[in-house]
Amino acid sequence: MKKRLSLQLLATAGALAIGLLGSSATVQAQQKLKWAHVYETSEPYHTESVWAADEIKKRSNGKFEIQVFPASTLGKETDINQGLTLGTIDMIISGPSFAERNYKRIGIAYYPFIFRDGDHLLAYSKSPLFQEMVKEFHDKTGIQITAYTYYGARQTTAQKAFTNCEGMKGIKIRVPDVPAYRATPEACGANPTPIAFAEVYLALQNGTVDAQENPLTTIEAKKFYEVQKAIMLTAHIVDGLITQIAPHVWNKLSDAEKKMFTEVTQQAAARASALIKKREGELVDEFKKKGVQIVTMDRKSFQDAVLKNKPLESLGFTRADYDKIQAAK
């Protein structure tokens, strides 16, 4: 009897030990990832990134625990892009203009007036041309682009309204430090001034710059309308954001996990894009109600100036890629 009881106790202890080891293995297998961006918590780029993080955790049965860090919490846009390479950040959503620093070709998406509208940009994101760029970018950097989100048509805000390219002459305007972003203001004789995204509001408020350019949804979220009197509907760049996964994460994922990360981030991008397009359609009237002057532009004057003063080839892009983008449907 005593012998039988001892055997039962040993069996129970063994089962408990195996259970504890199994639990420990599960904990060890869980991966905590950092997903960074520079946008506000109210914006779809954040809310849908949080949705994607939760969805990935759910679909992986808790293997991947992703924390989303918004509003430049982990650094400026340059910092978080560098973090992918350094291994300090695991995922980001950011503009292709930063990817362009390592792979020039992808920056053609910022050439002024290259996209007709948001639908055209999203058609390009599904095109063979963009998939070719994704592969070449990955081959060069190890970073994997999994999704493309519509960011919005970039409009110009300023203290003083203008109606055409000539009216921009001499204005000190904040733009990201990327040649294609500088192309329109430079073509019109303005003075483009690079300032970190998180510092733009203060720069407008204290007069360091006279103007800035961003989509209407960003102008709302960052409250730039509080320190600017007019919004000019230039729509000079139809902008997007790319979701990127660092090499030290992507290379360790199984094929099934890579597929899952791609599917979920693409779903999040589609959700955010739809929200941005809807909100853009509402904001002109809302800004008018806030007392902001809305100015319809002579966009052809901007296009002509860009084509004359900043031709495609001068920025390092090719006519072949431009023509393929124009054909995207």
Residue ranges of predicted features:
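N-terminal secretory/targeting leader peptides
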Residues: 5, 14, 30-120, 129-132, ...
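Twin-arginine (Tat) signal peptide motif
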Residues: 1-10
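Bacterial N-terminal signal peptides
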Residues: 11-22
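Sec/Tat signal peptide C-region and signal peptidase I cleavage site
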Residues: 22-29
